Amino acid sequence: MVSPENANWICDLIDADYGSFTIQGPGFSWPVQQPIGVSSNSSAGVDGSAGNSEASKEPGSKKRGRCESSSATSSKACREKQRRDRLNDKFMELGAILEPGNPPKTDKAAILVDAVRMVTQLRGEAQKLKDSNSSLQDKIKELKTEKNELRDEKQRLKTEKEKLEQQLKAMNAPQPSFFPAPPMMPTAFASAQGQAPGNKMVPIISYPGVAMWQFMPPASVDTSQDHVLRPPVA
């Protein structure tokens, strides 16, 4: 049997020469070996290149950050300048509108004061025109009402005129110059006529008390000279 004092008994059984390969007691460690085909110089070169690349990236990133910040600042300033230019143009245009004949003012506060004054004046004139328009509308309504009343009055007067014309035509119509033939007289009236030969009134039943000679001239009706002009026959 192998005595426990000899700790290298395994090496005696292996027919290979490993050089410095030794077996140590408790607490031994294996030596760190390099990968096959890779030298220590190449690994050092890789580490060095990685460090150089990182070092080269840091200044570039700082430059890009500064460029981006400067470009953002310049674009903001450009936008602000454009906004101010547009605002100045608006003020110049407003000043030219407020005072067409005079050169435009450069004081923005004065331009705003003039604009407020002009707006207040125009608002007052607009209110006056609105009130005048409402009063004119009321007058138009009143005139329309009077027009309708006058139209009704005109129609009424026209109707009365037509009635008066019809009445006037009826009054101016020619009257008949003769009377209809009287009916037969009774015998009592005939005997009365014989007893009163000088009576010129002939009783008519339809028209009692009407003289028959009413349409003859007075000279023809006069009988005072009959005994001279027409003597009775002997």
UniProtKB/Swiss-Prot annotation:
A GO biological-process term: regulation of DNA-templated transcription
Free-text disruption phenotype from the record: Plants are more sensitive to IAA conjugates.
Record's keyword annotation contains Nucleus: yes
Keyword Kinase listed: no
Organism: Arabidopsis thaliana
GO-annotated molecular function: DNA-binding transcription factor activity; protein dimerization activity; transcription cis-regulatory region binding
InterPro entries in alphabetical order: bHLH_dom, HLH_DNA-bd_sf, ILR3-like
Primary role: Transcription factor. Plays a role in resistance to amide-linked indole-3-acetic acid (IAA) conjugates such as IAA-Leu and IAA-Phe. May regulate gene expression in response to metal homeostasis changes.
Keyword annotations from UniProtKB, A to Z: DNA-binding, Nucleus, Transcription, Transcription regulation
Composition bias, Polar residues: 36-54
Tissue: Widely expressed throughout development, mostly in vasculatures.
Gene Ontology CC terms, in alphabetical order: nucleus
Residue spans crossing the bilayer: none
Subunit structure: Homodimer. Interacts with BTS and BHLH47/PYE.
Subcellular location: Nucleus
Domain bHLH positions: 71-122
Start and end residues of each stretch annotated as Disordered: 34-85
Protein name: Transcription factor ILR3
